[in-house]
Amino acid sequence: MVNKNRQLKEQKVAEIKEKMGKTEAMIMVKYQGLNVEEDTELRKALREAGVEYRVYKNSLAVRAINELGYEGIAQYLEGPIAIAMSYDDPTAPARIINDFAKTHKALELVAGYVQGEVFDVNKVKELASVPAKEVLIAKLLGSFKAPLSNFAYLLSAIKDKKEAEEQA
C-alpha cells in the first residue's frame, strides 16, 4: 500500500514537472475566498487564453520545482495556492489574473516565475500591464506601415511630377 501511494505521488510529481518545464510563465495566486461561480469564471477566462490553471498539493509542486532547478519560487507555495501556467504567451496569466483580482478581492497574486526569473507581486503587476503578443505585433506592423505608406506617396508624387514635366 505504501509503495502504491509513493508511486502515485512520483507519477504526479513527474506530471507537474513536465507541465512546469514547458511553461513560459507561472503565476501563483491565493484563491481562498472565491466562490464556485467566481472560480469557474476565472478558469474560463484563463482557458480561453490558453492558460492552464491548477491546484496541486504544495509538497508535490515543491518537489517538482526543486527537481527542475527553479530557484527562489518554492518558498511561495504555502497555504492554498493555485498556479496558472502559460505555454506561449508569458503575459497572459498575469494580465488575466490581475484584471480578475481588481474586481474579486478574494483572489490575491502571490508570485510568478517567468522565463527563468522569479517575479514578486509588483513585477507580476508590471508584467500584467504589457499588452498581449498579438497587440504588440500589430503595433509593430503599424509602425512599419506608416513610413512605407509615406514612401509610396513620395514615389507617386515624383512620378506625377515627371509626367507633368514631360507633357510641358
UniProtKB/Swiss-Prot annotation:
- Identify the SUPFAM superfamilies for this entry: Ribosomal protein L10-like
UniProt xrefs under InterPro entries:
Ribosomal_uL10, Ribosomal_uL10-like_sf, Ribosomal_uL10_bac, Ribosomal_uL10_bac_type
Its GO biological process annotations read:
translation
User: Ribonucleoprotein as a keyword?
Assistant: yes
List, alphabetically, the GO terms of the cellular component aspect: ribonucleoprotein complex; ribosome
Q: Which GO terms describe its molecular function?
A: large ribosomal subunit rRNA binding
Q: What does this protein do?
A: Forms part of the ribosomal stalk, playing a central role in the interaction of the ribosome with GTP-bound translation factors.
Q: Mind telling me which HAMAP family this protein's record contains?
A: Ribosomal_uL10
Name under which the protein is recorded? Large ribosomal subunit protein uL10
Gene name as annotated: rplJ
